[in-house]
């Protein structure tokens, strides 16, 4: 419960398939990886990119932590399962995408997504179930990054009666459309005053 299952650094178009972990402190940890010169000396650290399909990070306080993703390529998860939350760090500049993924809660879970940084984060055709286990008022998705997209997702926690998504002051663009919730669909918008925010067609 103190280890990290997968540490991924400077990859360029990495393809991960059928990765699994359980009972680790972090399932997948994306970092700035070392770049070496011809003498084997580290000269700099750079983020990577890749697509990860059919991954299952089971029973963990943090399923995915992204410190940094390649700015022009990013990291994409497809048809994957995360039994807790994903964290995108303030240092991130690259796009992060979750497509057709499922999120489930564990005891004491707060958010399913805690997002910071200057990169974009997208959730498309995902479902969320079991955030804020102790009903303390945490949103499912805490977004305080530059760009956030939440589209065609399903929120299955019927016990909450407070906002599902929080938009913080560092948000510059947000598109939240065509989502379904078992409880009232509500977004708390505290984004930058000049932000472009579209919230519509949610039920």
Task: Specify the residue positions occupied by each region the protein language model found.
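Extracellular/periplasmic carbohydrate-active domains that bind, remodel
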Residues: 1-203
């Amino acid at each position: 419960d103190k280890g990290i299952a997968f540490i991924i650094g400077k990859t360029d178009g990495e393809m991960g398939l059928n990765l699994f972990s359980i009972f680790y402190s972090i399932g997948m940890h994306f970092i700035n990886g070392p770049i070496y010169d011809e003498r084997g000396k580290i000269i700099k650290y750079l983020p990577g990119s890749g697509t990860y399909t059919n991954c299952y990070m089971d029973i963990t306080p943090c399923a995915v932590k992204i410190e940094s993703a390649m700015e022009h390529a990013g990291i994409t998860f497809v048809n994957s399962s995360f039994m807790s939350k994903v964290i995108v760090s303030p240092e991130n500049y690259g796009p992060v995408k979750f497509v057709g993924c499922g999120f489930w809660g564990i005891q004491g879970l707060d958010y399913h997504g805690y997002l910071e940084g200057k990169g974009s984060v997208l959730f498309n055709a995902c479902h969320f179930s079991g955030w804020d286990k102790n009903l303390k008022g945490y949103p499912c998705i805490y977004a305080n990054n530059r760009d956030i997209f939440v589209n065609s997702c399903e929120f299955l926690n019927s016990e909450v009666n407070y906002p599902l998504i929080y938009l913080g002051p560092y948000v510059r663009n947000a598109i939240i459309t065509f989502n379904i919730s078992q409880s009232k669909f509500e977004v708390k918008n505290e984004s930058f005053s000049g932000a472009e925010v579209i919230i519509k067609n949610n039920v």
